[in-house]
Structure formats: structure tokens, C-alpha cells
């Protein structure tokens, strides 16, 4: 007997096909990415970050849009993959591809670990400040007037030892 629990949102069509959820397929364990995808469609946080990042890549060699790279990285972090070493495996995951906007079965693989790592290390200090400003702007557009919002920012100093990149 199948248990059909209604979802709290409608699933969009994917590659002109109706999307259904089945917990017996054993294709991916990243079902929460459907929620993340819908939130991104509603809020556009990853799109805003991608637009704030300068793209210094050679236009003739670009295979992945900046938004796709940012969204793939955010999706990986949301699934518990904080560092980038799992991204070469995740780039073929059907739900990761779906979260980024690619066809799960037939769409091209997502950006590789090295591509995403280059993106993470590319911003200069002024560009990092622009990314922070984009997040603050995003926060400002989502706050409802008259509500109390608390930003809990951890300012704990964490010393980095050795010659670590971007260490103080």
C-alpha cells in the first residue's frame, strides 16, 4: 500500500514532464532540495548572489552559468556537504540537477568540484563586500514591516594557523 502524503506546495513541471515524488525509487536521498528549489524560485537569493559576482571567465569556455554554480554550491551545503570534496559525485545526482534547473535524467552534469572551488576563491575583498551587501539587500526585501527581526551574528575570532588561504 502506498502512502500518498500531499505536499505543501505544487511541484513544477520539469523538462515538460509532471514531477512526482516517490519514496521507493532509491535514486537520491536529497528530497529536501525540492523545497530549496521552490524557495529559491520565490526569493531569488542565489540569483541575486550570482548577479553580484563578476564573471571573469573566458566567454568561449563557459559551460555553467554563474547562477547554476552558486545554486549547486548552496544545494550541496544544504544537504550537509560543507566542503567541496563531494561535488564531483553530487554533480550527477538527479535532485541536485533538478535544484539547479537541469533535467534530472538527461541534463548535463553540474559544475565540477574544481570549477566550484575556483568560484569560491575568486572574489576579491571588494567583491566579497558586494556579496554581503546583496545578502543584506535580500534580507531587507523579505522583512515585513512591523515585525521584530533578530540577526544573530557570531563574531567569535577563530585563529587560523599556518599558511591557510585568506587567513588573517
Regions found by a protein language model. Give the residues of each.
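Dynamic "connector" segments at or just before major functional cores
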Residues: 1-168
Amino acid at each position: 500500500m502506498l502512502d500518498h502524503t500531499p505536499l505543501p506546495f505544487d511541484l513544477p513541471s520539469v523538462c515538460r514532464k509532471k514531477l512526482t515524488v516517490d519514496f521507493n525509487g532509491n535514486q537520491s536521498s536529497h528530497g529536501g532540495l525540492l523545497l530549496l528549489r521552490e524557495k529559491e524560485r520565490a526569493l531569488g537569493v542565489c540569483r541575486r548572489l550570482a548577479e553580484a559576482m563578476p564573471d571573469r571567465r573566458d566567454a568561449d569556455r563557459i559551460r555553467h552559468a554563474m547562477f547554476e554554480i552558486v545554486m549547486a554550491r548552496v544545494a550541496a551545503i544544504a544537504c550537509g556537504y560543507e566542503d567541496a570534496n563531494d561535488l564531483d559525485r553530487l554533480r550527477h545526482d538527479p535532485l541536485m540537477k533538478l535544484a539547479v534547473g537541469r533535467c534530472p535524467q538527461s541534463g548535463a552534469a553540474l559544475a565540477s568540484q574544481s570549477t566550484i572551488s575556483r568560484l569560491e576563491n575568486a572574489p576579491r575583498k571588494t567583491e566579497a563586500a558586494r556579496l554581503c551587501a546583496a545578502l543584506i539587500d535580500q534580507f531587507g526585501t523579505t522583512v515585513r514591516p512591523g515585525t521584530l527581526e533578530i540577526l544573530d551574528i557570531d563574531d567569535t575570532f577563530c585563529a587560523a594557523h599556518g599558511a591557510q588561504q585568506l587567513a588573517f
